[in-house]
């Protein structure tokens, strides 16, 4: 039998990291067991669902490299089918019409609150006669359709992450609402728990992997599966992603959407790698940098922890920096060129861009760090006080003059790393000047301070862009 997993997001907001991790776990397990990863858009909330959010979800999945199989199923296309199953449940006596008003429900909740009881519907219309139903309808009252839940029943299943889970019918909040706003003898608008069961059955889903906040929904849905004689899938409930305070990560924690992570400069490979370890602890490896394919080979739902997983910026940043360091210079230069273009910076040549990418990548945590790391190679930096103080020393100023004179005398010299070292050594021996003084003086001329990237590699780049002499001359004018 073909194994089939699915992601079923609601397009009511931007693609969130919690949904993205659920997608990742489903995709990884589908790859591991040779199954399919399917996508269903649950867009039946016509007020909050928006096409731009659907587009955002699809783009986010593609960016993360999580390719889905088969055509996308839109839940809104299946409303008539959902209604037909609610009708079946009505006809077999598993569901009924309830005309309780919002005011009556509010009064009931207030009464329960005053008594210290949890909120729970009292199922007051479970046994209405046909005449009573007709009377409510003739008065123009709308109804909801509720699914009967036996309070004495025990629902249990074996969760692939949490083991056996038991739930009592009396703890499910009363009879479950399947649809709302039913006028007359109509069915109304089908709701989540019914639609999910019907659509998962239609898609032949064998494994449902979702967040632990759905555990109570699973108990309710199992009862609907059984009432409709549908085959139960295997359920797995992943831990929540937590903030530093141990609370569920939310929009109040600032960055939560995949768009925001991308715009901040995180690589999709790095974010996927990090998300996989948010709650997953593989027994077969201690490695922390793994590609999606490598993870899928060892991924197992049983290795996912039950406890919530704390989100760590420090860890994500480290993983992202590792991916940047190990990226091919050609690919990295193509990516960071976009940042250069945004700032109006033009690389003298493709080879020059590759060399600069190699030079700065070890100092980068985020892709956007390329802006600050590259800036001194495109714009002349202001000389900082530490640089000014250093060059006020006569030896330092004289050392810089020696380098400038040498470069002017050797007009049109083709400078590479070896030649740069040779120049430093030659001037040092010829004029009895310490190499350290020469190099620090040159660093101030290039970067305006005593710190910066590798000097020799930088000099090669400044020489290729024909800016090394002009920077040294500019340095003399400013001191």
Curated annotation (Swiss-Prot):
GO terms for biological process: glutamyl-tRNA aminoacylation. InterPro entries: aa-tRNA-synth_I_cd-bd, aa-tRNA-synth_I_codon-bd_sub2, aa-tRNA-synth_I_CS, aa_tRNA-synth_I_cd-bd_sf, Glu-tRNA-ligase_bac/mito, Glu-tRNA-synth_I_codon-bd_sub1, Glu/Gln-tRNA-synth, Glu/Gln-tRNA-synth_Ib_cat-dom. Its EC number is 6.1.1.17. It is found in: Cytoplasm. Keywords: Aminoacyl-tRNA synthetase, ATP-binding, Cytoplasm, Ligase, Nucleotide-binding, Protein biosynthesis. A motif ('KMSKS' region) lies at residues 248-252. It catalyses: tRNA(Glu) + L-glutamate + ATP = L-glutamyl-tRNA(Glu) + AMP + diphosphate. The keyword Nucleotide-binding applies. CDD domains: GluRS_core (cd00808). PROSITE patterns: AA_TRNA_LIGASE_I (PS00178). A motif ('HIGH' region) lies at residues 9-19. One of its GO terms (molecular function) is zinc ion binding. Monomer. HAMAP family: Glu_tRNA_synth_type1 (MF_00022). This is Glutamate--tRNA ligase. The gene is gltX.
